[in-house]
Amino acid sequence: MYARYQRDQGYGYVTANSTGSSIIYGAVPQNAMVALNQVLKPNLLNEIKVGLNAPKTRVYASTPNVPGVDLSGVTISLSGVVSLGGTAGQQGSVGIASPTGQLKLSSALNGRAAPFTNYSLSFIDNLTWIHGNHNVKFGAEVRPEHLKTAFYGGTTYSFANIQAFLADAPSQVAFNGDTTALSPFTGKSGFSLMHQTFYIGYVQDEWKIRPNVTLSYGLRYEYYSPLHESNDKVLWFDIPTGTLIPNYTKDWYTMKTTNFGPRFGLSWSPEKSANKTVFRVGGGIYYGPGLTEGQTQPGVNDRINRTITSGPLLTYPDTPTTFLSNYNINDPNLQFQPRAYLPGYAIPEQIFQYSASIQQQLPSDTVLTVGYVGSQGRNLFLRGITNRITGVVMDPVTGVGSAVREFSVVNGTTVTNKFAEIDTKTSGGSDNFNGLQVMLNRRFSKGMTLGSQYMWSHSLGNSDGSKDARTSADNYSQSSEYGDNISDVRQSINLSALYELPYGTGQAHGATTNPVAKALLGGWQLGTLFNARTGTPLDIEIVRPDIVYRNKVTGAISAGPVVTGGVVMTTPIVNVPGGGASRNVRRPDLVLGVNPYYVSDGTLYINPAAFAVPQPGTYGNLARNALRAPGISQFDLTVSKKFSITETKNLEFRAECYNVLNSAIFAAPGGGTPRLNDATGIIQPGQPYTQSAAGGTFGALTSTVSNQVGSGTNRQFQLALRFNF
């Protein structure tokens, strides 16, 4: 019998941007385990475990201390660019940094803090039965999961430019309330207390058919009960009826019960190879519950949120009290924005994995392995929108167009929207991965070890999985998202070597030399590491308004109506079918015959002239993740020296140099999603972008992979001293 308890505590501080805004992280993970091992019979062993895992985390937004200015829970979003005035080595203009007292709490919610106090219990029993050439294992686990969560919101003020900011004239004010506040929908307050339980069972047999043939096969079953809120503090949006249901008690999604996962593996070493050749093949079906954050939306919905684009509340600054006191859940034009699940949303996600390899021992203690690995993902997480735009009505006097949505109420030219555009989640995504692996390794022998790995692979799909899934650019189909996944790295190589100077006690040379020489020349090790890979995918996106205006005479497209002499000269039309501005995942058209990459050694990497604004009423034809970031490579070096103190104690000094050649290792432009500016009225649909229209830093290499110690940095040195005993 044994018991274990571990508690860690750590804090992190990350600068958000150049304004001094930052994010503070705190984590206090705890885990405990009690286990009892029993020998029931000489060939029958049983293990019982009871465990606790309690990851307590806190994350806060921190703002700079400016006298007379309180940015707690506030974001100032400024559009436009600032000229750099010909600063040497820089682009002509840069975007404006936004002072903020908020951080990204989830994929669709910003706020000032998020405290999570979660824990899970594990009750596990494993039974091992050895019978002849069989090693059979049976096991079961019950794991209750408990989540105590909250999101503290904030206010975002958006300004069209610096002049509007100086005039205190925001174009939009977005307010998110706290999930712990008293809800006008459910009448409840406090933390969300969610729970679910995992049920897992398996049987597995390792059968040594012959001394050179081993077969492993088994079956695993997993079931994850749907999440529920303990007090039904839930606000459910029903998509078929377009209504809110407070204190919803039914399951939020379907949890499948047929989650059986067979697995097998076979290894064979031909007798004639003298155990120097091994063939391996295997496969299995695996299940996963998906990302928990994506399954908690009905609980997160139970809060006040509103977006102001006109009226007396469109002011700066304002207070949360103003938004709360004027909030009427029965307002027909409330524009409430919950998050919703499509009918048919089902869990779990499913992965089919399979592999085959051949391993051959070569002279000089070297082993060559060539293998294939593949997988197929099914029922993966997908995102989209509902309450889509279906049409436009125009004010006959001003020419202004108002979007008509699926749940809108239209009375003449007046449109009221109780709901804004709504983020949806569902299942049904797919992906596939195929990879060729080649490894050549030399075990530590005669003072040297060598390692080399190469992989060619390709990952495709219409979903990047729960954590990285993005909203479909086509609001009516997920099939258009099929393309390279963000994790797709076509080629990668890693080379490593470690050499120990053969001098000193136990070495080929210097074993009997004087102690001073052994102390100076013995115990040295030299290590090198080289890694390189091709670039990761780039998803080129574009900012487009949901509605644009077509001139009745010239056909030109503009961002707003044109009225001349009291006559409306334009017609409002739907620019992006269905809308989607809240998620802002839109792609441009690709201009044929134009190289999308700049052919130069400068920092401009993506050529905006290769892209154009799509015609109104159409989606861009550029595929998801169609371009590639620059590849990267890095060479590192380590030198170490051990000073023996006694037979079991020594002092080790290490000197490490990262990126010895000081190569520029640029990060993907735009964080992997370079976005073209909204150029409505600047260039017409079908007209290629210019650099100024795209944005001064569009497609530019402006940062390195990392500014910390390790991979992707500039040349850095690190010294370490360690006492081994």
Predicted features along the sequence, with ranges:
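Flexible, solvent-exposed coil segments and beta strand-coil junctions
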Residues: 8-17, 26-28, 97-108, 177-185, ...
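Extracellular loop and loop/strand-boundary signature of outer-membrane beta-barrel proteins
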Residues: 17-22, 31, 35, 109-113, ...
